[in-house]
Structures are given as C-alpha cells and as structure tokens.
Amino acid sequence: MNERYELNKNLAQMLKGGVIMDVTTPEEAIIAEKAGAVAVMALERVPADIRARGGVARMSDPKIIKEIKAAVSIPVMAKVRIGHFVEAQILEALGIDFIDESEVLTPADEMYHINKWDFKVPFVCGAKNLGEALRRIAEGASMIRTKGEAGTGNVVEAVRHMRMINAEIKRLTTLGEEELMAAAKELQAPYDLVKYVAQHGKLPVVNFAAGGIATPADAALMMQLGADGVFVGSGIFKSQNPEKMAAAIVKAVTYYDKPEILAEVSEGLGEAMTGIDIRQLEEKDLYATRGW
C-alpha cells in the first residue's frame, strides 16, 4: 500500500510547475494540450456553469470522460462528490489518471470523505487550512489544492487559503517537539504528519492553487505565494480568447517571477471572465465550506 502511495505522490510531483485545465469537450482538451497544460480535468460543466445552473452537481457522464481521454495524451482527471466512493470506483474502472474529491460538486456525505487508501488511483483534494490538508493526506490524498472559490473568477479565497496554509506550516517549524502533540490536537491531524511538516517546512505532497484563477497575473501570484502549480477552471473557456488565454497562463506559471514576460503574455488577451464578488455570495453558495 505504501509503495503504491509513494508512486502516486511521485505521479503528482511530475505535474509540478504546470497548469491543469478544466475541459468539457475533446476539442477543449486538445486546445489545453496544445497550450501546454500538464493535465486536464474532464467535466460536463465548468464551475461557473455549475454555479449558475444550481441543483445537484454530480460526477460527469463516463462517455464525456472517455471521449476526452481518447483526444489527448496528457493525464486526465475527473471530479467526484465528497464522500461518494462509488463515483470514485466508476472513475477508477474507466482508467482515469487522477480523481479530484471536489467541493465543487454537491457533497454526497457530510460526515466522511472517501477513504482513498481503498483505491490504486491517486487522489487530489481541496483544503483551506493546514488541518484540512493533513486530514486529507491521512486519508490517502496524493495531492492537495487550495479550495479557493471555484467558478467566481475571483482569486481572493485561493490567496487566503494559500497564505493560511503557509503561515500554519511556518508556525509548526518554530515549535519544540514537546509542543507538536498539542499542535496535532489543535489541527485535528495525525501526529506523524504534523511532525513531518514541522521538520521539513512543507507538506508531504504537492500543493497546487485552485479556485478563481482567471488571468496570467492570478496564476503568477499563486506561484509567487508558493503554489507548486495551478488549476484553472472557468477562467480559460469563459474568457474571450480561450486559446490565447490558455497559452498565456501556462507561460505565466513557468515565468511567474519575471514581470517583463508576464507583461508580454498579459497583453491583448481580450476580456477575462466576468467574475463574482465573493462578498455577494450567500453562505449556502460557498463551495469552500464544504467538507471538513
């Protein structure tokens, strides 16, 4: 089991420094691959449309996932509802490369997340703080991403979550060994993982940024804040020029600390997605609060 998990962590590590894009058709997947995406997330609807449509959001139709898998040579991910291990079993049977247990879909279980040790396929999970990240890793997640607030085109929550996780990691590195057990209790996370973070100053898995990334500048901001890579959902195919936006975001992630290049790739992209002011959302419309 541990060998398998090490392999899964290494698979996630290979995506480091890259962009993972949400796609809803084989054509979009091809655009993403051409633009330099390291993986695609196969969906029926991007988060902005899920948000607009309302109702219950579930796993995508296997037909869509198969068509997208057939169209590209890069890894394909797909989302399942929090706690819905049968949706995960179906995705594993389809030969998906990564499963995202995602708060963007309507949670199926409000008490338990999926026990990811039951699966061979690697999982990615969202987190808004260190305790949440470590609980997901304890359940077998091979990759963490900020939750942000998907489908809003507003990066503020992703920034908040990344800063929060970084600050909590930094704090652990300053604690003496005798204080770590109390920290584990406070974080509601296993002691061995808390100890690992305290010793290494980082999570034991890669930590990507997600939720509200809409422009090359947003992507570079998350990288400068310490993200290992970025997920871009609605931001690409809800923009005026998806091909150009996709290529620009990939470049921005590669050259995140080179303002001259960022200025160049940000030019003439057309309108970014309209976006939503998060303060206008009601509590029930917030995705980041789903899961624990």
Curated annotation (Swiss-Prot):
D-glyceraldehyde 3-phosphate binds at R163. It catalyses: aldehydo-D-ribose 5-phosphate + D-glyceraldehyde 3-phosphate + L-glutamine = pyridoxal 5'-phosphate + L-glutamate + phosphate + 3 H2O + H(+). It holds the Pfam family SOR_SNZ. Its EC number is 4.3.3.6. GO terms for molecular function: pyridoxal 5'-phosphate synthase (glutamine hydrolysing) activity. It comes from the Bacteria. Pathway: Cofactor biosynthesis; pyridoxal 5'-phosphate biosynthesis. InterPro entries: Aldolase_TIM (IPR013785), PdxS/SNZ (IPR001852), PdxS/SNZ_N (IPR033755), RibuloseP-bd_barrel (IPR011060). Transmembrane segments: none annotated. SUPFAM superfamilies: Ribulose-phoshate binding barrel. NCBIfam families: PRK04180.1 (NF003215), pyridoxal 5'-phosphate synthase lyase subunit PdxS (TIGR00343). Belongs to the PdxS/SNZ family. This is Pyridoxal 5'-phosphate synthase subunit PdxS. It comes from Caldanaerobacter subterraneus subsp. tengcongensis (strain DSM 15242 / JCM 11007 / NBRC 100824 / MB4). The lineage of its organism: Bacteria, Bacillati, Bacillota, Clostridia, Thermoanaerobacterales. The gene is pdxS.
